[in-house]
Amino acid sequence: AHMKKPTLIETTENGKRVSPKLPPGMKNFLIDIDGTICEDIPNEEPERMADAALFPEALEKLNKWYDEGHIITFFTSRTEEHRMVTEEWLNKHGFKYHGMVMGKPRGGNYHWIDDREVRATRYEGHFTDLVERSATVQVFED
């Protein structure tokens, strides 16, 4: 269920070309797999991956975001040896997505440092609409 990636906007700063940006309003969703779109299965038990229990509302919400034009990329701690069984599972259930990045570090407590805008949403059991909310965040001191 792969689709052509969107046209990125070429960007320059101080007369030099820099990494391109997404069009306004478009999001790059990086979505975990185990415990987020299906039951949590550790890499040590790959025989369970083909029959992982789906979280139906995840399928509904992610496909809605895909249909709205956002980029859907799965970012998982599963390894390359799990890619085929994972892609087969995603396709069997009808997930629409653009790509999958394997080998996310395990253990949680992620802290992403980037020169681009980053938002993080912790999955706590339900895929609902995303809403704006203020929170305390850690930033680099000026």
Q: Predicted regions span which residues?
A:
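HAD-like aspartate-dependent phosphatase fold
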Residues: 3-142
